[in-house]
Every structure is written in structure tokens, then in C-alpha cells.
Amino acid sequence: MKYRWIAVVLILALGLSACGQKTDAPAASAQHIPAALKTTLTPDSLPQYDFTGQAMTYLAYIAEHFPNRCASDDASGHDAFGQWLLSELAGCGYDQVQTQDFEEKSMYDETVHGRNYILTFPGRSAGKQIIVGAHYDGDGAGDNASGVALALATAAGLANAKPYYTIKFVFFDGEEDGLLGSKYYAGHMSADEIANTIYMINLDALVFGDYCNIYGGVYGDDYDAGYIALSEGEAVPEPTLTEGYDFAADTAEALGFRVHRTAELDGYFEKNGRGMTPEDAFFTNPWTNAHPAPENMFAASPATIGASDQAGFAVKGIPYIYFEATNWWAAGAEPSLAYTGYIETEDASLGDGGMFMNTEYDTLETLNELFPGRAEQHYHLFSPLLSALLLVKAE
């Protein structure tokens, strides 16, 4: 979610999708939208795994040894991280990791040579799959060593599991340059792959923000993933394709977690003049057309804007589930970013006006100093939910 504001400015000015090019999307049809995600969800029926300890270990290791993983930067630890990732997965018993190289223009019109890493975990069903994505490029602990750490910990922890669906863990490159790796991957999926993908789960920036959020949904019948050019006073289209979010929220509740959904959040800020008190619970974007953000209304609940790797899949009609930690109720120090979900903490004196991603403050040292125990607290929410979503039969 790193380049969100630059993208928003471009989109509002030009009316284009990310990277300045609108992705062709299929028309709504049964072959592109999976069957309703319905199953009996009870604590006894759900697999319950928590890989927080391993995620914390990976987060600390990546932050220390690979603080700079920027794409196409020979001076960074980008390539070294890729070699370590392959070695780590091989140590978990995964020796058939595929690489997907690409050459794409960034949103700055620079050529980026990137590489995605794809781990395929075969399932028992015929052709059905779930995709888990986390981008590894960048230079932040929160953004996005935290997402990579959880994906790695989950892949390692489930190495001996027998999932119903095939699971693909994809470590994307080039997110910071315009979602390049994820759009390339999604753009090269076959029609059968698209039709047989239950949902895509995006893990991005999980540890700094005040609230643990789940998102899902796109805007309009053309599957706009979240970039919309709005006239003054025009409402954001109501989200569709929210099956992924709904199923994730249902699963979280079945696991015993508190989930604050759109209906509960709608109008809370207007009534109380503040956001809810942070707690060990799941939240989502609180803004709706009935009770919009005080400023900068760009996204309607439970969706977000398409500034992370779920976007390329959403425009293909694939339901997504997006995990992120941030604070939609925070105004921050920069008016143009107020209430957009880009401000991660309420206290604007921390970080850069309440922001950490894409700043010098996105380090593990800062995280532990300002928010001791927060990373572990968040992983204790995200990890069990992720594992359950990968192992439960969703149809």
C-alpha cells in the first residue's frame, strides 16, 4: 500500500487505473465469479493454527538482514533476499518454487526488471485454488516485511497439511513501482485459472497501524478495483464482489474473534467525533455513502482503494481478502491524506504525521519503541484467520 497517495492523485487527475492503464476486465458472469462462499463455520469445524512466533522470527530477520529490497536496485538486498527466500522455502521442504521474471514500466515511466516467486501447495480438489500474495520489494519493516513474514510462517507451518484447495503463495515484486508484479501475474492467468480461483488474500503492512482491518469488494459492474475519478460531490459507487470479505468476517467470528463490520461502523465517527477504541478485533474501512469520510472520500466500506496487490486480481473478477493494519479515523498532519486509511496511527506527532510506510520511521526499532508488543498482537489475529481461510472448504 506504499504508493497509495501518488496513485490517488494520478487517478483523480487522469481517471486512469494504476500505472496509467485500465485493465480489461471480463463481464460479470458465473464463470468468473466463484460460487457463494458458504459453508458451516463453527469453532469445532475450523482448523486453528497460530504461527505468530515464527512470523515474529521472520520479521526480525528480514528487517535486520534485508532492510532494502527495492526492485531493480543492484545496491539493495533485493536479489540477496530472493536467494534467501528460496533457501528458506527449500528448508521447509519446498524445492519446486517457480520464478516469474518480468520487465514493465513503473508509474514513474522507468523500466523495472522484477521477479515473482511462486510456491504451489497442491490441494485435494480438482483445479480449485487460493492465492496468497505478499510483496517483498521495498525498504520497510511494516511495509512489507510484515506481510512476507506471515506468508512465510504460514507456508512453513502448513507444510504437512492436506488442504482441500491448491494454495499458491506468491511473493510479488515491483509493488512500490505500481503493482507491477501482481498485475503481471494476474494478467498471465488463464481463463480456467481465473474461474477456479476461490479468492486472493493480500497481506500488506500488518504491524504498525492502530487497527487490524479486513477489506473486500470492488466498485461498479466493470470491476474497478478502487481507482475512481469522482466529480465534486459524486458518491463512491457501492462495492460489489464482497464475497471474500464476508467469508473472512464470518470465519473470524467462528474462530471467536470480534469483528466490527460495516453496519456497526457506519456513522460511528459522525456520532462520536472519534473512532472506536482499538482492541483485539477486526475492523474495516468505516466510511459509507450514508456517512462518508469528513474529507477525501475515496472508498466505500468494506472495500478500499486499489493501491495494493489485490487490485490486479479484483479487475479479473476474483474476490479478494485484504489484511492491513492502519487507522481510517486518523486525520494526521497532512490534510490531503486525512481519513484515507494512509495514516497509520491517531497520534500525528509519531512517525511522519502519523505515517510510517514510505518514511524513515518504517523500521523494527521504531515499531518496538513506539508500539511494544503490537506486531505480536496483530499476528495473533491475522495468523489464525489466514490459516483457517486456507484450510476450510469454502463452497
List each language-model region with its residue ranges.
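His/Asp/Glu-rich mid-to-C-terminal helical/loop segments that flank catalytic regions of hydrolases
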Residues: 330-395
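Bacterial signal peptide processing site
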Residues: 20-22
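A non-catalytic alpha/beta surface segment that caps or lines the substrate-entry region
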Residues: 57, 61-122
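Alpha-helical metal-binding/catalytic segments enriched in His/Glu/Asp
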Residues: 119, 128-179, 386
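Metal-dependent peptidase/peptidase-like ectodomains
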Residues: 174-320
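C-terminal motif of bacterial Sec signal peptides marking the signal peptidase cleavage site
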Residues: 14-18
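Extracytoplasmic/secreted proteins, especially bacterial periplasmic and envelope-associated proteins
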Residues: 50, 54-57, 61, 76-91, ...
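Second-shell loop/turn segments in exported
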Residues: 41-50, 63-79, 104-108, 135-144, ...
